[in-house]
Every structure is written in C-alpha cells, then in structure tokens.
Amino acid sequence: MWTPPRNDQQYLNWQWYSSILSSHAAMCGCPDAVAHFNHLASVLRAPQNPPPPGPQRNLPLRRLPALPAAPEAPGDRAPWPMAGGAEGEDGGAGGDADHGGAAGGPEDADLLDAVAAAETRPQETQEGHRGVPLQPRRGAKRKLTFPPSQAPQTSPPVGRLAAGGKRVAKLRGRDADRLPAAQAAAAATANPGSQTQTPVQPSPKNPPKSRYQPYLVTKGGGSSILISNSTINMFGDPKPYNPSSNDWKEEYEACRIWDRPPRGNLRDPPFYPWAPKENQYRVNFKLGFQ
C-alpha cells in the first residue's frame, strides 16, 4: 500500500549526501569527498555496461566430484622379464620363452609356480568345532570353546569333616541317594504308618501356666498392690533416694521463686496454692447405649 513520504525533498537530499560522505570517510582519508568524486568521474567517465556473461556452468553444489574411470583390466598376465640384453639381440632365446621355455632359469620358474598356486588357492576361513565360522563381535567378551575331546577336566569334589573327624566326600546326583538319611526318608515315605505321630498341641481354652506369676506386696498400712514380676525395668531397679543438702537448697529456692510451700518428699509433685483449682464434674445419671 502506497503511503506519502514522511520527509520532504530537501531532507531526502541531505540524507543521500550524508551517506556519500560517510561511505567516503569509511574507505578514504582525503578531506574533500567532492573533489575525489569529480576526479573519479573525469578518469572513469560514465560506467560501462557489464561484460557479457561467460559460458554457463551447471556444477552441482555440495556434491563430491565423480571419480575417474577405472583402468581397463589386463587380459593375460605380463610375461616375466628375461635375463639378458634387449629383445632384438637374442631372438632365439625370446622364441623359446614365447613357446613355454624357461628363459629366466629354474629359480624363476619355481617362483612363477608358487605365485600361480597362491592365486588359485581358495581362501581359508576359520571355523569352530561345529562348522560355524567364528566372527568375533566388536566389544563382546571372548569365550573359550573346547571340543568334546579337549574339554578341561573338572576337579574332584572337595570333602568335608564329619563329626568323628573323618573326611566324607560330597556326593552328587544319583550318588546322594545312597546316604543313610536319604534311605530313611524313602522308607518313611513308602510306609506312612510307621512314621512318628505329631504330638497334639494344647487347646487355647486350657493354656499352660506361665512361669511369670504376679505376687502381692503389702504396705505398712495393710493395703496390697498387685505387681507382676514379668515387668522389666529398662534402667534397672530404683535405688532409695536420699536427698542431699544441695537438693534441699534448690527446693527452698524454687519455693521462694514460685511462692509455694516446700515438699516433705522431693519425689512428690509440688503444690501451688495460688493456682486455680481444676474443675470437678459430677455426673448423677448414667448413659445407656443399646
């Protein structure tokens, strides 16, 4: 969508002239850009048309150039070079070599036979004892395989000492059935009537008497307390407490601070007369639930 220019002609000319001065200052150090431009205009004159383009080259981008053509495979194997002068000097020897004669000597003939045998020999492949070619995988651990005839012999079973100090060998597989314990178990399975009867467990209604029986401890006032001797004190039996002078000093110091009467027995809870009394609730009816 066309819009009217935001700047007038004078301001546009000033921007163009400023751009020329800035570009000249970026590439040249002379102080007069106008004189430099006039000198270039007189020397170079009007710009000529661009030269015609050359032959178009359709080169593939980001692609490797094609490899050169492979050389032609030779038909027959080149003859072995003859020992001696040029071919034209001894024509008779060359004729013998062309007809299958050994012009180079017996050593050269043996070497040619060895090379021909090596080329015609089939490539050998390493195979395992089952005929499967061994192809080690990269990063896999090598595992030793032995043919049945070369399998390593296992060590004999290690013995153990019996109760009498005699060494008894460990039996494996079918030999373990000949042990006395195994024979006794097999005989018991065959004759179920001869097995020992399992004793009957006592009924829960008549449990056996516990070895821990409670006993009564009578105080000086004649009241008795039921105490069970099955109770275990984690810190041991309590010892008689005999307060020292320091304990009584701390007791009277606490009485002065908390404004309470002293205790006769330091194990008794303290009494604070100024503390509010606990609310006592008395219920004169019973709640029945059905």
From Swiss-Prot:
Protein name as it appears in the record: ORF2/4 protein
Coiled-coil ranges (or none): none
Pfam families the record matches: TT_ORF2-like (PF02957)
Low complexity bias locations: 181-190
InterPro entries: HEV_TT_vir_Orf2/Gyrovir_Vp2_N
Biased composition (Polar residues): 191-200
Start-end of Basic and acidic residues biased regions: 121-130
Upper lineage: Viruses, Viruses incertae sedis, Anelloviridae, Torque teno virus
Region (Disordered): 67-218
Highest rank taxon of the organism: Viruses
